[in-house]
Amino acid sequence: MQKVVKLHNIKIGNDLPFILIAGPCQIEGQDHALFMAEKLVKLTSKLDIPFIYKSSFDKANRTSINGVRGLGIEKGLEVLSKVKAEFDCPIVTDVHSESQCTETARVVDILQIPAFLCRQTDLLQAAAKTGKIVKVKKGQFLAPWDMKNVQTKLKAFGAENILFTERGTCFGYNNLVSDMRSLAIMAKLNVPVIFDATHSVQQPGGLGDSTGGERKYVELLAKAATTVGIAGMYMEVHQDPDNAPSDGPCMIKLDNLESILIKLKKYDKITKEK
């Protein structure tokens, strides 16, 4: 039987209707976060899709020293706390060091381990010790079966609720490719699997001093992943992605999200029909 991770009234499992993890790449300010959260909560409620809000307080791995990193942990967590209080929705955000885990866990429901850091044992240990759900993004450099080692580490440190995320694999320079087999392979580890549809279209460092991306392929990859049978879809969303401070070329425009989700619900239902 497939593992089901429970978060309040949300059940996350590969055999269950998919959940949506969405929000802007980074926290741009309180007003913007509340605006985005309100839109996303209303839309997912309308479509009956379980929803978790995502946004980052620090983009610690920006390509260039000039890249905008975000509000930082103190102000960022303050904003996420207000989003949670205002809309009563679960929150996920990234942690980049062991020292951030305890403080972040006081506010959010899920700690996300970035792909570049997925093998960092001390970080995994610190995240596991908080007792929160730990969501690990598979490194672009890892085979899906290598995530067994990540799972073993987390379990050794006491983590009971683990999510894995597929976000693409390095394919030459400045390019990623999505191997849909990864979703099925990681699911065999008895872990709910999330597909990151927006980071999967990244072109890392593709613009020289920033990351490029091919937004036009987000929907295509999301549909393909949904037909495999996944626990959730992860999408970064913005009302004006072309002017966003980070990952603009990859993010979905807010106005286009509803039509994509309607299609994904249909694919998901067909895939999981008994």
Swiss-Prot record:
It is found in: Cytoplasm. Pathway: Carbohydrate biosynthesis; 3-deoxy-D-manno-octulosonate biosynthesis; 3-deoxy-D-manno-octulosonate from D-ribulose 5-phosphate: step 2/3; Bacterial outer membrane biogenesis; lipopolysaccharide biosynthesis. Coiled coil: none annotated. It comes from the Bacteria. It holds the Pfam family DAHP_synth_1. Its EC number is 2.5.1.55. Its main location: cytoplasm. GO terms for cellular component: cytoplasm. Gene3D superfamilies: Aldolase class I (3.20.20.70). GO terms for biological process: keto-3-deoxy-D-manno-octulosonic acid biosynthetic process. It catalyses: D-arabinose 5-phosphate + phosphoenolpyruvate + H2O = 3-deoxy-alpha-D-manno-2-octulosonate-8-phosphate + phosphate. InterPro entries: Aldolase_TIM, DAHP1/KDSA, KDO8P_synthase. One of its GO terms (molecular function) is 3-deoxy-8-phosphooctulonate synthase activity. The keyword Transferase applies. Belongs to the KdsA family. This is 2-dehydro-3-deoxyphosphooctonate aldolase. It comes from Rickettsia canadensis (strain McKiel).
